Amino acid sequence: MVDKGIKKIPVQQLRLGMYVHEFSGSWMEHPFWRSKFLLRTEDDLARVVQSGIKELWIDPAKGCDVAGGVSVTEVRKEVERELEFAASMPLPLDTAESTQAALAKATALYRRSVPRIASLFSEARLGRAVNAASCTPLVEEISESVMRNPGALISVVRLKQRDDYTYMHSVAVCALMVALGRALGVEGDALRQIGLAGMLHDLGKAAMPLEVLNKPGKLSDDEFTLMKLHPERGHAMLVEGGGVGPLVLDVCLHHHEKVDGSGYPHGLSGEHLSLFAKMGAVCDVYDAVTSVRPYKNGWDPGDALRKMAQWKGHFDTRIFQAFVKTVGIYPTGSLVRLQSGRLAVVMAQNPTALLTPRVKAFFSLKSNLRVEPTEIDLSSPWVQDKVMACESPEDWPFKDLDRLAGLLAPR
């Protein structure tokens, strides 16, 4: 967000005549097709307040103003401080395999996973009992991939296509849960259960009408209310099918709860939520907002973390900090601006220094031209360059960032 004059205000200060620039929260959690509009009617004002949104950005240049509020610059500085603090947390996880080798194996696993998850959802949609045990081999494969290189599978599944989102979201959240679990010190069978919970957390969507689940547009209020039933539907399916433990059931039922008590289905606050449900909330939202959906492109991974850091009351602070450490302040595939006046795409994390990833510079801001792609390890003592800021891909005409990052094979 580079707009000058934009300010963040609590929803209690919202008035008719204000120009809403952006809601502070996931675009999945509000009933508006557009996030930028002039607030003209009492009905729209009531819908914003009733949606549970706590804060939002307004543009005083396009509508009414209000005293106070927090500027973009102030919010950005606070978020960067929080992310840098999270990056400084110790995380003694060594990558046991090279990035390219891990990416190749992760890509193969990605391709094998789609039909297996699709079959599971199809069986559930037909009303047949869910055989959770059938997922165990796939969870084991995903866990092993994360152990070899935590960033590889997470990066690859981010490239999911619109038509396989529901299935690959299950794989992505499984991988994210395992990686986050390792960061939090979870081991053994508990780690496998966390992975299984991630894979099955959205099973209840198999009970949703396909025309709602795959709707190529924003859901209506009634459709959104229906979709909010999926945690309870999934929980019921898993209980009926048997063979899953309380950890998996807990994550399925409570992954949409928030620590401030404003989530669903039960409105539980932080002290009533388990570690695993809080993990599920972070992993589910991160993958959802960074994924391409039928009606919206995904956010850049770096942008997603920075926006999530602003959503006070959504996530457990300790878990979110560990998550940032897990995926990196500059996740693979992110677009960054270097001190040298170049744009670069992040290729891999430096596990011991998240502020200095390995990048590929490919564009000169001085000449405004593409240059020969050059790999740079920013952690090297011989390299004087550094990341100055994340850039939003939406502000640039680049269509090949994932290919430059090494996530896709050359054409």
Where are each of the predicted segments found?
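Histidine- and acidic-residue-rich, metal-dependent catalytic cores
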Residues: 103-411
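Membrane-cytosol interface segments
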Residues: 1-130, 388-411
